[in-house]
Curated annotation (Swiss-Prot):
The lineage of its organism: Bacteria, Bacillati, Actinomycetota, Actinomycetes, Mycobacteriales. Binds 1 Mg(2+) ion per subunit. This is 3-methyl-2-oxobutanoate hydroxymethyltransferase. Mg(2+) binds at D64, D103, E135. Residues 1-24 are annotated as: Disordered. It catalyses: 3-methyl-2-oxobutanoate + (6R)-5,10-methylene-5,6,7,8-tetrahydrofolate + H2O = 2-dehydropantoate + (6S)-5,6,7,8-tetrahydrofolate.
Length: 283
């Protein structure tokens, strides 16, 4: 039985009908208790989010890393709430069973807990996000507490915090030497404030493992060794979509960039040669 033209979407493929459990925060807690590790990826649009859900990724982060990989900024600092909200909408639609977390951009939460609440509320109401992420440890505990009390789940982010790249003096490992005590204090502070999980970025593996064992909430590593409860990567780095040098903690699991470049070149060549579209692609 063939599908009629009216039933075939003009662009992209139809959404597959695959019943799947909606990922919720209690599931992540249970996975930690059971010693079951899980993967998180960034996502910035409907199509990639759909693929990641089909691949079994339970948590998707609409990260402020969109500043780099979507908008082409040099750092994450310039991106705004208005630039991120449309991306969140697409991801939520593309991955209806994933837990979708939205990053609070630089300058939208540091000033006060009320400022954080205003920004987070926009992501929940206008974007459809299920949770928000913000950077910082003890210094943002008040913000985390207010958001949690208001019914907004919070994923914390400690260690290297990209929004503070100018203060930190570049991309540097955090938590070495005397910094270990502060990182542990930050981890405990965000847990006590009500965060449901915490990202640890560019932290020595041994220290990250120590924090993971100390906390009752899941830890998510990026450049923090193998002992975290979960791992996260920017999807373009993970899939080999970006070119050039990547961070030490990145492993490329594909070569999407080369494949896409080759596909685009082949398409352009067939158009120039007049071989596309052929009879099979014409009405």
């Amino acid at each position: 039985m063939s599908v009629s033209d009216s039933e075939t979407p003009a662009y992209g493929a139809a959404q597959p009908a695959q019943p799947r459990r909606k990922t919720r925060i209690p599931h992540l807690r249970q996975m930690k208790a059971d010693g079951e590790r899980w993967a998180m990826l960034t996502a910035y649009d409907y199509s990639s989010a759909r693929l990641f859900e089909e691949a079994g990724i339970p948590v998707l982060l609409v990260g402020d890393s969109a500043a780099n990989v979507v908008y082409g900024y040099d750092t994450t600092v310039p991106i705004t709430v208005d630039e991120l909200i449309p991306l969140v909408r697409g991801v939520v639609r593309g991955a209806p069973h994933a837990l979708v977390v939205a990053d609070l951009p630089f300058g939208t939460y540091e000033g006060s807990a009320q400022q954080a609440l205003a920004a987070a509320t926009r992501f929940m109401k206008e974007g459809g996000a299920h949770a928000v992420k913000l950077e910082g440890g003890e210094r943002v505990a008040e913000q985390i507490a207010l958001l949690t009390a208001a019914g907004i789940p919070v994923m914390a982010h400690i260690g290297f915090t990209p929004q503070s790249v100018n203060t930190l003096g570049g991309f540097r490992v955090q938590g070495r030497g005397d910094g270990a005590e502060q990182l542990i204090a930050d981890a405990i502070a965000v847990q006590e404030a009500g965060a449901f999980s915490v990202v640890m970025e560019m932290v020595p593996a041994e220290l990250a493992g120590q924090v993971t064992r100390k906390l009752t909430i899941p830890t998510i590593g990026i450049g923090a060794g193998p002992d975290c409860d979960a791992q996260v990567l920017v999807w373009q780095d993970m899939a080999g979509y970006t070119s050039g040098k990547t961070a030490k903690f990145v492993k490329r699991f594909g070569d999407i960039g080369d494949q896409l470049r080759a596909a685009a070149a082949a398409y352009a060549a067939e158009v120039r040669e007049g071989t596309f579209p052929g009879p099979e692609h014409s009405f």
